[in-house]
C-alpha cells in the first residue's frame, strides 16, 4: 500500500515538473524574435560612433568607442574637439565700408578645446522588442587641452599722398585693444592667420549626461546625448579684452552621433 502511494506521489511530482518545464519554455518558443534580439545585444560587445556636438558656447565633433562590461554597464573612450566662445562676444561690422567683414570686437583669442577621456555608461531602460528608445546615463573624465589662437584683423591706415589727399591702406595685424577700435578695424583677417602662434593650456574635464539610442537594429547606433561638461585649466586662458582670464568653461551640450556595434 505504501509502495503504491509512493509511486503515485512520484508520478504526480514528475507530471508537475514536466508542466513547469513546458511553461518555462513557452515564452522562448512563442517569442523567438525577442530572445534573438537580446542575445544579439549581449553578443555584440564593441561599438564605435561619431557625430557633432552643439554646446552653449560653440560646437564641434566627437567620437566614442565602447565595450560592454555586461548587459547593463559599458566602458567608454571619449574624444572631442570643440571651439569655445565667450558669452560676451558680439559680432560687429564697420558701417563705413560696404564690403567690410564682421568680427568679434574685443576678442583676443579664438579658443579650441581637445578632450580625451574614460568613463562608464549604465543602462536605465532597455528598448522593447518591437523597437523604441534605450535610455542610459554616463559619466566621463579625462584630459582637456585648451588651444588659444591670437585674433588677427585687417586694419585701416591713412596714408598721406599730399597735403590735402589721403589714401586708405589695409594691413593685417594682431588685435591690440589699445590700438584698434571700431573706426579703424576693417574686418576679420584670414582664419588661418595666427596658428603659428598657438598657445597650449593643459587641463582636465568632466562630462555627465543621458544617452538616448534610437537605432532600429542592435548592430546600428543612432544616438542623442544631453548633458553638461566642465573644462578646468590651472593656467587661465585669455579670451576677451578687459575681462578676467578663464579658469574654466561650464557648458550644456546636445550631441547627435551614428555608428555600429560589432565583435
What are the functions of these language-model segments?
Residues 44-48, 55-59, 73-75, 110-114, ...:
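Residues that define the transmembrane beta-barrel architecture of outer-membrane proteins
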Residues 52, 61-67, 116-122, 141-145, ...:
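Residues on the lipid-exposed face of transmembrane beta-strands in outer-membrane beta-barrel proteins
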Residues 81-115, 119-130:
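Outer-membrane beta-barrel translocator/channel fold
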Residues 140-225, 229-245, 258-262:
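Outer-membrane beta-barrel transmembrane domain signature
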Amino acid at each position: 500500500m505504501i509502495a503504491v502511494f509512493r509511486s503515485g506521489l512520484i508520478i504526480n511530482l514528475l507530471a508537475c515538473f514536466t508542466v513547469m518545464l513546458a511553461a518555462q519554455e513557452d515564452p522562448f518558443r512563442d517569442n523567438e524574435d525577442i530572445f534573438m534580439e537580446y542575445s544579439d545585444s549581449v553578443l555584440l560587445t564593441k561599438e564605435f560612433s561619431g557625430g557633432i556636438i552643439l554646446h552653449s558656447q560653440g560646437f564641434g565633433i566627437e567620437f566614442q568607442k565602447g565595450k560592454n562590461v555586461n548587459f547593463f554597464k559599458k566602458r567608454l573612450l571619449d574624444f572631442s574637439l570643440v571651439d569655445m566662445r565667450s558669452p560676451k562676444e558680439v559680432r560687429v561690422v564697420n558701417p563705413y565700408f560696404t564690403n567690410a567683414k564682421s568680427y568679434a570686437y574685443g576678442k583676443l583669442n579664438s579658443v579650441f578645446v581637445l578632450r580625451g577621456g574614460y568613463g562608464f555608461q549604465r543602462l536605465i531602460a532597455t528598448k522593447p522588442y518591437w523597437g523604441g528608445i534605450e535610455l542610459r546615463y554616463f559619466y566621463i573624465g579625462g584630459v582637456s587641452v585648451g588651444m588659444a589662437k591670437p585674433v588677427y584683423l585687417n586694419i585701416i591706415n591713412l596714408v598721406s599722398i599730399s597735403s590735402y589727399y589721403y589714401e586708405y591702406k589695409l594691413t593685417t595685424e594682431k588685435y591690440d585693444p589699445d590700438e584698434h577700435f571700431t573706426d579703424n578695424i576693417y574686418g576679420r583677417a584670414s582664419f588661418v592667420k595666427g596658428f603659428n602662434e598657438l598657445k597650449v593650456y593643459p587641463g582636465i574635464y568632466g562630462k555627465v549626461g543621458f544617452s538616448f539610442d534610437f537605432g532600429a537594429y542592435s548592430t546600428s547606433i543612432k544616438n542623442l546625448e544631453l548633458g553638461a561638461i566642465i573644462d578646468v585649466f590651472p593656467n587661465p586662458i585669455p579670451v576677451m579684452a578687459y575681462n578676467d582670464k578663464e579658469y574654466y568653461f561650464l557648458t550644456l551640450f546636445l550631441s547627435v552621433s551614428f555608428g555600429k556595434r560589432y565583435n
